Amino acid sequence: MARCLSRADLSRIAGKYIDQYYTRFGISKDAPEPIDPERLASAVLGLNVKMLPLCCDGSVLGLTVFQRCGFTVILGDGTKLVEIFMPKDVVIDSALAADSCTGCRNFTIAHEAAHHILADLFPNDYGKAVKCRGHIAYREQNGQPSWEEWQANTLAAELLMPTFLVNAEIERAALCLPNGILYKSASDPNYEKILEMAARMGVSWSAIKIRLQQMQVIKGKPIHCHPLDII
């Protein structure tokens, strides 16, 4: 069973790894830069990030490996692929290689890296097994909310969108929402500014909107709100 960590706990954990990342690449928080999850995974966590076909229907976007294991996938044309994965492998579905999938790809890498972080920090609480995830939204197991998936999603968001970086991007984009209301329309200049922020940070529109709502920059209940979410 996963240890029950709050959003604040996960934010502190993310901060430690972001500090290591910034130190490794000579980045200062006085001039913060977006976090590249693949560089974080490889240079800071020692993970091997690979891109391979994982499914033919989009049901599996990524997996993280703690033990040597085999993985078989049948592609749409009937081709059977058999791969052997090793510990510390993070495998991302090659369908996410397109530029249009940058946000999804980055979040998937960060999510799988988060599983490794949590397993390393709390080895008695996280099973050493292959973890597959099917989508960016919260994954439920047996119809019940999963703490492990919620924590991996939340830690991934904290790694990609730490508060100090989001605040810096808000200032850079001159985002101004005095009443906290955002209209998803080209007529609202803030909409384009937030799209620009998302592109700079390598995340999706949905991801940055949720983060801005959590930071109370935008009013309203975060979309995809999960029963276990602690804001």
Report the location of each language-model feature.
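Active-site hotspot residues in diverse enzymes, especially metal/ion-binding acidic/histidine motifs
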Residues: 1-231
